[in-house]
């Protein structure tokens, strides 16, 4: 098989260009406002200005990134850089911001190629081609970045560069890249325990002497803290204000649309119990659609410390497994630790957005190449996780694109897994039934709700069904995959397989 990587890059880029005129969310105005703030206001006003409700709440490296973009934007349409010009979206502005996402996806492309190379995959193998397809044509990134509008490709590109460096045992480069990533978007802090344990165990503690180990720790601290010094240094006098923007705990337990996690089921159980017991809401409703603090009617109130404690508790087993793993097996355990740390934060985190499922889905694409069990769990989560992003694309004009892109991607994913693992059909009956159950949600949303005249009486029900039903799959994946990762038999499949497409074909023919 030829190296078709750059062909896939071209196909992905063409698709992204076609989506430029598509609907975009309020996040488009968020980033336009950040362009205006960083271009028009002095540095000490960046994290203070509140002209728009969409205040700057990403770490300083992302603010510097917006400033760099603004230096180009001023030649495209300077009116987009006026702070008071709220909700401004000229055609030039739309094209500029859309193209800025596409161009910065180059970092993601480099991250994918680097990471797959670090796994030892030959560029002419079926595994390399399959992983390239799953990552470069990832439907989640297409939904979130190139329709909804964000810059996740840039961020996940840096993450993949860090992972690739770690697997190649370029520990300091990995630590540096991950520290840079944290200063672009602090949500990746939830993956930091996996990186920290790996670097401590397989870099610092692998040194020949105590002196060398101490030296390794010092190097890591210098390399890791330097990006923070460069990032936050100019804001030292305003550090409390910056941190209050980065960690706004008054936003409430869940977002307006419940991310498909444990708290979605918790909220649903509270609503059900309140209905059965005929208890009236004692505060802001969890289904009000507003970003605010809420009170549960029946179940105990949840506070940020509770969510942090649960997140840390559920990260602990895989981190212990990583620390105790043999060096030869450590890259595989590390990748699973990254996935499960990300999933722990998604399942139990405070005010989690549905988009955060990408922190689990994208690293999991790397693990689909390991063996059938990883692939099986990845597919189940993919069905639920990518479907849970549909509420981001609520405009009626997007129904056909969202369903066609989703169905094409999951079909492509199944086809590639079948080629890597001939005879791949390893789903349990309940898994099949669960995945097929997703067809009922659009059937209700687009047909039954109108036939039964429920579209006006219960307009929120499709969102509720999407959130709760997807949450069942996410929690199933989290529990089942966690148990699998902790009890894995390491002798079955190496992390890097040399199986070529020709070998796969021979194997299939001899069955």
From Swiss-Prot:
Main location: endoplasmic reticulum
Catalytic activity entry: an alpha-D-Glc-(1->3)-alpha-D-Man-(1->2)-alpha-D-Man-(1->2)-alpha-D-Man-(1->3)-[alpha-D-Man-(1->2)-alpha-D-Man-(1->3)-[alpha-D-Man-(1->2)-alpha-D-Man-(1->6)]-alpha-D-Man-(1->6)]-beta-D-Man-(1->4)-beta-D-GlcNAc-(1->4)-alpha-D-GlcNAc-diphospho-di-trans,poly-cis-dolichol + a di-trans,poly-cis-dolichyl beta-D-glucosyl phosphate = an alpha-D-Glc-(1->3)-alpha-D-Glc-(1->3)-alpha-D-Man-(1->2)-alpha-D-Man-(1->2)-alpha-D-Man-(1->3)-[alpha-D-Man-(1->2)-alpha-D-Man-(1->3)-[alpha-D-Man-(1->2)-alpha-D-Man-(1->6)]-alpha-D-Man-(1->6)]-beta-D-Man-(1->4)-beta-D-GlcNAc-(1->4)-alpha-D-GlcNAc-diphospho-di-trans,poly-cis-dolichol + a di-trans,poly-cis-dolichyl phosphate + H(+)
Subcellular location, record wording: Endoplasmic reticulum membrane
Keywords: Endoplasmic reticulum, Glycosyltransferase, Membrane, Transferase, Transmembrane, Transmembrane helix
Membrane topology per record: Multi-pass membrane protein
Chain segments annotated as coiled-coil in the UniProt record: none
Pathway this chain belongs to: Protein modification; protein glycosylation
InterPro entries for the chain: Glyco_trans_ALG6/ALG8 (IPR004856)
GO molecular function: dolichyl pyrophosphate Glc1Man9GlcNAc2 alpha-1,3-glucosyltransferase activity
Source organism, top-level taxon: Eukaryota
TM region positions: 4-24, 94-112, 124-144, 151-171, 210-230, 300-320, 332-352, 356-370, 377-394, 432-452, 469-491
GO cellular component: endoplasmic reticulum; endoplasmic reticulum membrane
Function: Adds the second glucose residue to the lipid-linked oligosaccharide precursor for N-linked glycosylation. Transfers glucose from dolichyl phosphate glucose (Dol-P-Glc) onto the lipid-linked oligosaccharide Glc(1)Man(9)GlcNAc(2)-PP-Dol. Functions in developmental processes such as germband extension, the apical constriction of mesoderm precursor cells and ventral furrow formation in early embryogenesis prior to gastrulation. Involved in the glycosylation and intracellular distribution of shg (E-cadherin).
Family: Belongs to the ALG6/ALG8 glucosyltransferase family.
PANTHER family: DOLICHYL GLYCOSYLTRANSFERASE, DOLICHYL PYROPHOSPHATE GLC1MAN9GLCNAC2 ALPHA-1,3-GLUCOSYLTRANSFERASE-RELATED
Entry protein name: Probable dolichyl pyrophosphate Glc1Man9GlcNAc2 alpha-1,3-glucosyltransferase
Organism for this UniProt entry: Drosophila melanogaster (Fruit fly)
Gene for this chain: xit
